[in-house]
């Protein structure tokens, strides 16, 4: 393919920059900020940026590339929501879809859903770095958080992602444990909880469907409150 930014459609490249940053740079935002500051102060006559991962950047896109890294390194997110969930029998997935529909109906355009058993972890992390609201749903498995969800939570923890909104939901058959074990993640990460955690026993009832929709609306309202 092409080598220079001016010769290609960059829409895919911006998404890849998010994905690379989330997976590789992640927690080192303070160091990125220091480098960006030094670079600006040096005022070097740069003609090309030859990145090891991505195209050769020309001055036409310098500001966009620097602005994106500046925002990511400050954990500044776009308006949007990431619903990540695990499901064993499909019940948690139904609730995930319901919450996502409530968010969209509340006026939020960017709503992404990830079944953690199938979505690549790199794509999930990319979207968490990109969007402000994170909604985590898990069934209870052997009195614990579903393992794929637990793994993603650990990846988020290692990257020290800051300044996000968190909502929690889940399902169980015998004894509900997953939801109550996810809730403390908000305090651990310094995130703001939005809405009351939702938990269903087995399949979704009409009442819980309504509550899922309402939670989605609350998330949308919290996101819209940040508009200026």
Where are these regions (language model features)?
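Short aromatic-enriched loop/helix-cap "lid" or pocket-rim segments at secondary-structure transitions
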Residues: 1-2, 61-64, 180
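FMN-binding flavodoxin-like domain, especially the glycine-rich phosphate-binding loop
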Residues: 3-50, 54-56, 98-112, 124-228
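Terminal amphipathic helices with adjacent charged low-complexity linkers/tails
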Residues: 48-81
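A general structural motif
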Residues: 61-68, 94-95, 114-123, 144-152
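Long, well-ordered mid-to-C-terminal structural blocks that present hydrophobic/aromatic surfaces
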Residues: 79-125
